[in-house]
Regions:
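N-terminal first-folded block
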Residues: 1-39
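Charged, alpha-helix-enriched surfaces in structured cytosolic catalytic cores
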Residues: 4, 46, 50, 67, ...
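Solvent-exposed alpha-helical segments within well-ordered globular domains of core cellular machineries
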Residues: 7, 27, 31, 49-53, ...
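Signal for well-folded cores of large energy- and translation-related assemblies
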Residues: 10-14, 30, 56, 77, ...
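Acidic, metal-coordinating catalytic cores used for nucleic-acid/nucleotide bond scission
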Residues: 41-45
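C-terminal structural segments of small proteins and small subunits
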Residues: 70-103
Length: 103
């Protein structure tokens, strides 16, 4: 996973609004509040499939994080695993532009 994506993810968490976890991410997708969804590569396939489905309905970009849920948790500076997260407000981060523009 690109160090730039990790840095921008940390900036979004610090300066914007981000929800962690599959259930909260799904809730934000269903309510059309998520601007970007990030899911760990090793998340269970049914979770990835469901998040991709709801992301397509709300036309929300989804990024499959190239690391494990443990690595995604570490990238978020959390002492626990994170299978999915939703960015509601990127704050000072450029992560939305990086994902939409391909980095």
């Amino acid at each position: 996973m690109s160090a730039d994506i990790v840095r921008e993810l940390q900036t979004a968490i610090r300066t914007g609004k981000v929800v962690l976890g599959y259930r909260r991410t799904l809730r934000e997708l269903v309510n059309d509040r998520a601007k970007l969804v990030v899911v760990a590569k090793n998340a269970p396939s049914h979770i990835i499939k469901e998040l991709k489905y709801y992301a397509s309905l709300s036309q929300t970009p989804i990024l499959v994080f190239e690391g494990s849920s443990r690595e995604l948790g570490a990238a978020c500076r959390k002492p626990f695993m994170v299978s999915a997260l939703a960015i509601l407000d990127p704050g000072e981060s450029n992560i939305l532009h990086m994902v939409q523009g391909g980095g």
